[in-house]
Regions:
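Conserved ABC ATPase "signature" region
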Residues: 19, 24-34, 91-92, 129, ...
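Conserved ABC transporter NBD signature motif
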Residues: 84-92
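Conserved ABC ATPase signature
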Residues: 162-166, 170
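A short, proline-enriched helix->beta-strand linker immediately N-terminal to the Walker B motif
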Residues: 181-185
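Conserved ABC ATPase "signature" C-loop
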Residues: 241-242
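ABC ATPase "signature
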Residues: 247-248, 256, 324, 385
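The conserved cystathionine-beta-synthase
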Residues: 287-310, 314-318, 331-334, 351-398
């Protein structure tokens, strides 16, 4: 079994008559469309398996009807699974008796919906405290805790206002505060920010990320906004037709999309904001070592010409970057009869970039630099190079 705070194994949900027959037909290779046409059964979720780590924000994405909202409701059993298992902290939620399931939801789970679902007759404080009221906490205890979480989301001064007196973003903050009030270890958020305008949505993303830094919780976040997923997600799971097509970090999926469906999700993404120098580096620039004696200019010139390369990098015996030199400059030295060694005074100094430098910052450096730029690892050693050609190819998705 996979490890994690939440582990989903071979999960299915079939709506309609004879659900087990529909699962058997899926395993035989029938499409969900054929099963619907010939058996009248709708496949909501099909053989989904994945895990979510403790303290992770795991984002589920997919087109409308791909099964995202059904899947998260199978995890907390608002919808009963047809087959499969859901483990939370090692406990199989799919097999729990109703009383234990209710206790688990009250103690350990919260959910935030796209519609704020605030009670209009209750003030902000009472809305935030509602989960604690259901859990049987005293008025004093729940109001104290509700004020704490309202403070966290920046709404303490609005505690005695009513929902109609708040903006949409503020109402969603109340919904988030209500989810946090019971101090759950996991939160399920179903397109929680999608009804907000772009500025308010980003503001709520900032609130969530800030709260996560202060008190890390396990969060499953459903979104249709790829920029949102890239910004807040530790990992992203992409669904299509009830199946989980790919799971990975934003960088992993950008670099290695599973298929065209996944690739199309990222067509509008500015990759330079999410990739780093380390992910773009290559060994495309010939490397020569200054090991107490500088490389010979004629030898370097001949090798560059043979490789059809225009630049060379020089490193010392410990792989520290020493400098760069162009084929044009070396050729002039050689043609002038000066087949001397490439000592430091002949090299061009270029400040290397660290592997974790975001690509948008790398682009700025490439624009002002004539040739490729060197990349160094965490220990300061040379680890590769980035050229303009390499950058353009990567941004084109090649």
């Amino acid at each position: 079994m996979q490890s994690g705070k939440i582990v989903v194994q071979n999960l299915y949900k079939v709506f309609g008559q004879q659900p087990q027959e529909a699962i058997d037909l899926l395993k035989q290779g029938w499409s969900k469309e054929k099963i619907l046409a010939e058996r009248g059964a709708v496949i909501g979720v099909s053989d989904v398996s994945f895990s979510v780590n403790e303290g992770e924000i795991f984002v589920l994405m997919g087109l409308s009807g791909s099964g995202k909202s059904t899947l998260i409701r199978l995890i907390n059993r608002l919808i009963e699974p047809t087959a499969g298992d859901v483990f939370i902290d090692g406990q199989n939620v799919a097999k729990l008796p109703k009383s234990q399931l209710i206790d688990l939801r009250r103690r350990d789970m919260s959910m935030v919906f796209q519609s704020f679902a605030l009670m209009p007759s209750r003030c902000v404080l009472d809305n935030a405290a509602f989960g604690l009221e259901v859990a049987g906490k005293s008025k004093k205890e729940r109001e104290k805790r509700a004020m704490e979480v309202l403070e966290q989301v920046g709404l303490a001064s609005f505690a005695h206002k009513y929902p109609h007196e708040l903006s949409g973003g503020m109402q969603q903050r109340v919904g988030l505060a209500r989810a946090l009030a019971v101090d759950p270890s996991m939160i399920i958020m179903d397109e929680a920010f999608s009804a907000l305008d772009p500025l308010k949505r980003r503001e709520m993303q900032d609130v969530l990320l800030d709260l996560q830094k202060k008190h890390s919780r396990t969060i499953i976040f459903v979104s249709h906004d790829i920029e949102e997923a890239m910004r807040i997600g530790s990992r992203i799971g992409i669904m299509e037709g009830g199946k989980l097509i790919q799971v990975g970090t934003p960088q992993e999926i950008i670099e290695n999309p599973a298929n065209d469906y996944v690739r199309n999700f990222f067509n509008t993404v500015d990759c330079s904001r999410y990739l780093t120098a380390g992910q773009l580096k290559s060994d495309s620039v010939p490397l020569f070592v200054h090991n107490g004696k500088a490389p010979d200019a004629q030898m370097v010139c001949q090798k560059l010409q043979a490789l059809d390369k225009h630049y060379a990098f020089i490193v010392d015996e410990k792989n520290n970057f020493r400098g760069s030199i162009s084929l044009e400059k070396i050729a002039l030295l050689v043609e002038g009869g000066r087949t001397l060694d490439l000592e430091q005074n002949l090299l061009k100094h270029i400040d290397p970039v660290p592997e974790d430098l975001p690509l948008d910052s790398v682009i700025q450096r490439l624009v002002i630099n004539e040739g490729p730029i060197p990349v160094i690892d965490q220990s300061g050693r040379y680890s590769g190079a980035i050229s303009k050609g390499r950058l353009l190819s990567r941004l084109r998705g090649e």
